[in-house]
Amino acid sequence: RYGLYMIDEANIESHGMGYGSASLAKDSTWLTAHMDRTHRMYERSKNHPAIVIWSLGNESGNGINFERTYDWLKSVEKNRPVQYERAEENYNTDIYCRMYRSVDVIKDYVSRKDIYRPFILCEYLHAMGNSCGGMKEYWDVFESEPMAQGGCIWDWVDQGLYKSLPGGGEMIAYGGDFGDRPNLKAFCFNGILRSDCLLYTSPSPRD
């Protein structure tokens, strides 16, 4: 009905390796893998009108591999900005995009005289259970400070799977419902929308 502004993110996440010297971002033997996923993202979505920002990946440290993917994207993309959270204030991001930072941190950043990149929270207000408190305080800053430009609530939609019931019908299942061990139980239920993309009735996205 209203349309969506979308950030397309390369399928790169390696936070299990940490952000220090062992990070795959710093290991040039992984450059081809980083470039391949960045190329595929761009070629798949370059003509999609809803894509307004590219993201190099998520929680994967920063280093030579993300510098090269940034350089390549900027060489082929002349209009849309490129963001990467772990780049922080290094050159290989056009947006200062942090996750789960407090309102005070945002205020401190936008009050600086030396900034030229907007602040956008690439994740905030982890929407699990009766969550998302404090949204008004964030949006007071977003609406009053030109360089504070919003954020992405994690997560947009639950990630449960349909499972058939013995007596007929089906349910939306989560960790453990398939006999899987170990599992994270209901941790995949952390979205604003249900797994079937319908609205929750309580609390509702409008709340």
Describe the residue ranges of each PLM region.
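Extended substrate-binding grooves/exosites of carbohydrate-active enzymes
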Residues: R1-P203
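Aromatic-lined ligand-binding clefts that engage carbohydrates, nucleic acids, or primary amines
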Residues: R206
